[in-house]
Design a protein with these regions (language model features):
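Conserved, mostly hydrophobic/aromatic
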Residues: 3, 31, 35, 43, ...
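Hydrophobic faces of well-ordered beta-strands that scaffold small-molecule active sites
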Residues: 3-7, 39-41, 71-73, 101-105, ...
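Flexible, glycine-rich active-site loops centered on histidine and acidic residues
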Residues: 2-17, 79-142, 180, 188
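An alpha-helical appendage that flanks or caps ligand/catalytic pockets
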Residues: 123-150, 190-298, 328-331
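Active-site mouth loops of central-metabolism enzymes
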Residues: 7-22, 76-83, 154-164, 273-282
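A conserved active-site cap/scaffold subdomain adjacent to cofactor or substrate pockets
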Residues: 170, 174-189, 195
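Acidic (Asp/Glu)-rich catalytic clusters
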Residues: 32, 59-67, 90, 94-101, ...
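N-terminal beta1-alpha1-beta2 module of alpha/beta enzyme domains
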Residues: 1-66
Length: 331
């Protein structure tokens, strides 16, 4: 089973967005050397915690600084943009870096509604237009008769992916004949049948003749379970602050996270968000990921790892690669 990376360019307390981007670039090179298959970057707006607001620009830098790992958006939030312009961007990247570009698109705003309206040229949100936008984007990328034709035209088109965390996105991906990435790290309480909905509604397309799905999971891997749980506290507390808008949402130290006293509701939120995370030793994480892939019926696994310390983040991926024997080409 192939293993991939989603990186959100997290900003630690005491750090900066510039530092976060440099760490994302370094992590792409590091995970490529370890044998990971894809490296995707996310889109978020108006947040102190995550630096990536323009994945298409970061993708160009990542592709330039790596050699063969697939580079993608995880994802571009299509309702904010013109599908035609997104197609031009994706084709440009595919011309520069042939056979390496994944274009993951999603419906979620990636921000609050105030910022979502600011992203729109007329101050109106268009999330209800997403299915139509996806259909148009497919035609622009893959239909040679589409007019006006999208230029430049690469020798090999980018791979369009649907991203989502709900049955609606799974069904739409199936109907459009697209590969589907389910964000379990965003919606950990979703029924394991989510990918069945995708498979049942799948209509083969020239790009994707049979269903293909990946599952994105929060992962923290360390030499001991205790250390992995300690490292995971940073993400858990910072995400709680991010979700509630209370406190500094930048990635805090494990020591600060451990000192936070949670209410019963806050603890329940943290526990629920961590229910499908893979946190532990390499063997524990490997077993949890295989178990999740089997339960959901996923073809591929994508991992997202956030720690306060960048070296701990790299170490987590190194241990994971070793557990999956990525360097042997067998996983």
């Amino acid at each position: 089973m192939q293993l991939s990376v989603l990186d959100q360019s997290p900003i630690r307390q005491g750090g900066s967005a510039a530092q976060a981007f440099q760490e994302t670039l370094e992590l792409a090179q590091f995970t490529e050397a370890l044998g990971f298959h894809r490296f995707w970057v996310s889109e978020h707006h108006s947040t102190d915690a995550l630096a990536g607001s323009a994945p298409e620009i970061l993708m160009a830098a990542l592709a330039q600084h790596t050699r063969h790992i697939r580079i993608g958006s995880g994802g571009i939030m299509l309702p904010h943009y013109s599908p035609y312009k997104v197609a031009e961007i994706a084709n440009t990247l595919a011309c520069l870096y042939p056979e390496r570009i994944d274009l993951g698109v999603g419906r979620a705003p990636g921000t609050d509604m105030v910022s979502a309206r600011a992203l729109s040229i007329d101050g109106k949100t268009r999330f209800d237009k997403f299915p139509e936008q996806v259909e148009n984007l497919q035609s622009m990328l893959y239909d040679a008769d589409f007019r006006p034709a999208v230029k430049p035209q690469p020798s090999a088109s980018p791979n369009l992916w649907m991203l989502g965390s709900s049955p609606d996105s799974a069904v739409l991906a199936g109907q459009r004949g697209l590969p589907y990435n389910f964000a379990l790290f965003i919606n950990p309480h979703m029924d394991t049948r989510i990918l069945e909905y995708y498979q049942q509604r799948f209509e083969p397309s020239a790009q994707c003749p049979k269903p293909y799905s990946s599952l994105t999971v929060n992962v923290i891997c360390a030499e001991t379970e205790q250390e992995a749980k300690r490292l995971a506290l940073s993400r858990q507390i910072s995400f709680l602050r991010f979700a509630t808008g209370k406190g500094d949402s930048r990635i805090c130290t494990p020591e600060e996270a451990a000192s936070v006293v949670l209410s019963a509701d806050e603890q329940a939120f943290v526990d629920q968000r961590s229910s499908h995370a893979a946190i532990g030793t390499p063997e524990q994480v490997r077993d949890k990921l295989f178990s999740l892939a089997e339960a959901f019926g996923a073809d591929e696994l994508m991992t997202v790892t956030i720690t306060h310390d960048f070296e701990a983040r790299k170490r987590s991926y190194a241990l994971l690669a070793d557990a999956f024997k990525l360097s042997d080409g067998v996983n």
